[in-house]
Amino acid sequence: MQEIFLCSISNVRSGDCKEDCAYCTQSSHHQGAIKRYKFKDEKVVLQEARALRELGALGFCLVTSGRELDDEKCEYIAKLAKAINKEELGLHLIACCGRADLEQLEFLRDAGIHSYNHNLETSQNFFPKICSTHTWEERFITCENALRAGLGLCSGGIFGLNESWEDRIEMLRALASLSPHTTPINFFIKNPVLPIDAETLSADEALECVLLAKEFLPNARLMVAGGREVVFKDNDKKEAKLFEYGINAVVLGDYLTTKGKAPKKDIEKLLSYGLTMATSCH
């Protein structure tokens, strides 16, 4: 039976981002109807960590909105990491806090963070069409910094932004040069507050994207993330093919500003596909 890994997300700082990423409702350039808060209370984060670990999650990603890490965010994430690790839950902790330099990432590593997530999102060529406030190159350098700091690298992208297949190949080729431990695969879902006007990918095209990712990243843990519940809806037969085509990790529960599948029902469905849940992160 195929073993899959469950990962969960905690949006520990939400909204009011000054970047203009066209795919993100957390940008202050878009009037998204989302919750906005500076820092989530530590007790709430610990409750989330315990609950999700009990459901079987092995990865727990602490995500902050905004362009980059700063001293305040570093201290906050470090404090959360130490508190979660003190619980001895056996969680693999990931931080996702935007652009970061080597010193900042080493600080997080020493505080108990195991991996850093920073997605390339799309190809270097297509990126200026979806963001003007920072460059693709900045993203790539942050990924390199994570590796230099001795952190596991989690880096992937979004399919369905109106990019071409050539753009998809270019992104995957760049990711392959980084050899990430985990690659999140997201499918863009149109939102009326966002400037990207793109139709939701069909399940068949999404599966083709997964096959392509597996070809370029045969050794990475491919994790299906945002958009799965919309692209595959109730099409169990095609959703099951995700795992035949190379997916071996799943985001369990909600995303940053959108609802995911109900965790218990999602796990039941995954088990019905003949999958088993990993019990340790390796």
UniProtKB/Swiss-Prot annotation:
Question: Any idea of its EC number?
Answer: 2.8.1.6
| Gene Ontology molecular function, alphabetical | 2 iron, 2 sulfur cluster binding; 4 iron, 4 sulfur cluster binding; biotin synthase activity; iron ion binding
Q: Which InterPro entries match?
A: Aldolase_TIM, BATS_dom, Biotin_synth/BioAB, Biotin_synthase, Elp3/MiaA/NifB-like_rSAM, rSAM
The answer to whether the entry has keyword Signal is no
Q: Name one GO biological process term.
A: biotin biosynthetic process
Residues annotated for [4Fe-4S] cluster binding in this entry: C17, C21, C24
Essential cofactor(s): [4Fe-4S] cluster; [2Fe-2S] cluster
Q: Which residues bind [2Fe-2S] cluster?
A: C61, C96, C154, R221
Q: How does it assemble?
A: Homodimer.
Which family, according to UniProt? Belongs to the radical SAM superfamily. Biotin synthase family.
Q: What is this protein called?
A: Biotin synthase
**Organism this protein belongs to:** Helicobacter pylori (strain G27)
Source organism phylogeny: Bacteria, Pseudomonadati, Campylobacterota, Epsilonproteobacteria, Campylobacterales
